[in-house]
A protein has these predicted regions:
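Cap/lid and interdomain-hinge subdomains that line or gate substrate/regulatory clefts
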Residues: 1-90
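A glycine- and small-aliphatic-rich helix-loop capping segment at beta-alpha/alpha-beta transitions
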Residues: 6-18, 124-129, 260-271
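General beta-strand structural signal in soluble alpha/beta enzymes
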Residues: 49-56, 80-84, 107-112, 117, ...
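Active-site pocket-lining segments that scaffold enzyme catalytic pockets across diverse folds
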Residues: 78-104, 110
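Short, flexible loop segments at boundaries between secondary-structure elements
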Residues: 111-139, 270-273
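Conserved, well-ordered active-site substructure
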Residues: 243-245, 249-273
Length: 273
């Protein structure tokens, strides 16, 4: 992802595509049609006043004084749009933010994950650490929980199953879940099947691969119900054979599976790729 002259770009298959033209912008609950970040801010809060902007050119040139001055003169609750195309530019931004904070400024961030890595001053994750982490599972099989149903996720899922033909794929019928409102026995049966599968190999637990919505429910409400069902399945897995590792795909899914499915309250983040 890159932001240049206020436009947020996404690199897809070697081609830069404006974020508003990606499938993520067509989300039924969080979608948007704004080309620039300034337009996006205006559509969300309505006439927020003058929006300051820091250019990628200033960040690329390492003009710390100019970048810091933009932050220092920003008034209370003023929006500042950041343009950046690489981590070196984000490092300059972080340095300017820290200088401005030393002078009393306080900032609230609405960002992509790349900024978190820059703000925490982390380098790219060491793949050796990931390999060592995976090898600590004492040979137990893994569980992949897929709640996201975007086109990108489907491509990734198909690629994984194609390259790992021995992995077992089980599906939660989300439309039946949403239509019934009470899917307890089916969730227990699916949990048993996942547990039996983990005894023999790794398992993919996926939701129906198309977006589904319950009667008189918004997509967001439906998504929360589906996520809760995945959590219930995970919580009912047999305790004598837990998965050696877990991959959770989807923003809501990854949070809920970790926090509510496995009761994890604190983790170590190895890095942002």
């Amino acid at each position: 992802r890159f932001t240049v002259e206020g436009v947020h770009w996404v690199l897809q298959n070697g081609e830069l595509v404006a974020a508003r033209d990606t499938e993520f912008a067509r989300d039924p609950d969080f979608g948007y049609d704004d080309l620039t970040l300034e337009e996006w801010v205006n559509s969300k809060v309505g006439a927020p006043g003058e929006i300051a902007e820091i250019s990628a050119t200033d960040l690329a040139g390492g003009d710390l004084l100019k970048v810091t001055s933009v932050l220092n003169v920003a008034s209370d609750a003023q929006f500042v749009v950041i343009n950046a195309t690489n981590y070196l530019q984000l490092a300059t931004l972080v340095e300017a933010i820290e200088e401005s904070e030393r002078q009393g400024k306080v900032f609230i961030y609405r960002t992509g994950p790349s900024f978190v890595r820059a703000r925490a001053k982390l380098g790219p994750p060491d793949l050796a650490d990931l390999t060592q982490f995976a090898s600590s599972s004492t040979g137990r099989h893994g569980l992949v929980v897929v709640g996201s149903s975007t086109e990108l996720t489907n491509v990734q899922l198909n690629e994984m199953v194609f390259n790992h033909s021995r992995i077992q794929v089980l599906e939660l019928n989300t439309q039946a879940l949403l239509d019934s409102g009470n899917y307890g026995p089916e969730l227990k049966q699916l949990a048993d099947e996942v547990g039996q599968g983990l005894a023999k190999g790794s398992v993919v637990l996926q939701t129906t691969r198309s977006k589904t919505c319950g009667p008189e429910m918004t997509m967001a409400e439906s998504g929360r119900m589906i996520s809760q069902a995945l959590v219930e399945i995970v919580r009912q897995l047999p305790g004598d054979n837990p998965p050696g590792w877990v991959i959770a795909k989807g923003g809501i899914t990854s949070h809920d599976i970790l926090k509510s499915g496995f009761d994890v309250s604190m983790t170590t983040v190895l890095g942002q790729a």
